[in-house]
């Protein structure tokens, strides 16, 4: 890989991955907003070479923010690693780790998910005070006072105005 790098040839992570590392992939939601009513992983777990299959039932329930600011982040702590509610197409549903990419791909196809599809908020112009809440949960929080209110679909709000320049 070093020679390829210095000669300007493309190098991919798979080119430098240790031979004994696991392949990890994520099953993602096909829905913009839905509840996971049932998720069956038993057939995926039986695939040769599969080491681990995780769903919302298996991961810690500790919220975090995905916004990427420094601490204390003004963006809301509104995400779990995996949860039983998906909020966008591509939201993670399950994580599979295995010895080969072929095994992981096969396991992903064997995970069976039953969704209750919900109305989605697809336009930020109509999101505020929409009856469809993106984050209806009670353990949602914002570390900084930026006007966040999950019961109004607000991750932040502000006020703009002019003061009295003569006083």
Model-derived segments and their meaning:
Residues 1-147, 151-154, 165:
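Flexible, low-hydrophobicity surface segments
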């Amino acid at each position: 890989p070093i020679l390829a790098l210095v000669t300007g040839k493309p190098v991919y992570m798979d080119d430098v991955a240790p031979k004994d590392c696991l392949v990890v992939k994520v099953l993602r939601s096909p829905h913009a907003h839905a509840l996971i009513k049932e998720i069956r992983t038993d057939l995926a777990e039986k695939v040769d070479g599969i080491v681990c299959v995780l769903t919302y039932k298996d991961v810690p329930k500790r919220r975090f923010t995905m916004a990427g600011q420094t601490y204390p982040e003004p963006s809301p702590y509104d995400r779990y690693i995996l949860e039983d509610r998906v909020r966008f197409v591509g939201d993670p549903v399950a994580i599979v780790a295995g010895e080969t990419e072929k095994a992981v791909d096969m396991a992903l196809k064997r995970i069976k998910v039953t969704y209750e599809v919900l109305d989605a908020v697809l336009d930020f112009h109509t999101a505020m005070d929409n009856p469809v809440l993106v984050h209806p949960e009670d353990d949602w929080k914002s570390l900084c006072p930026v006007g966040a209110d999950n019961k109004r679909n607000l991750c932040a709000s502000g006020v703009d105005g002019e003061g009295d320049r003569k006083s």
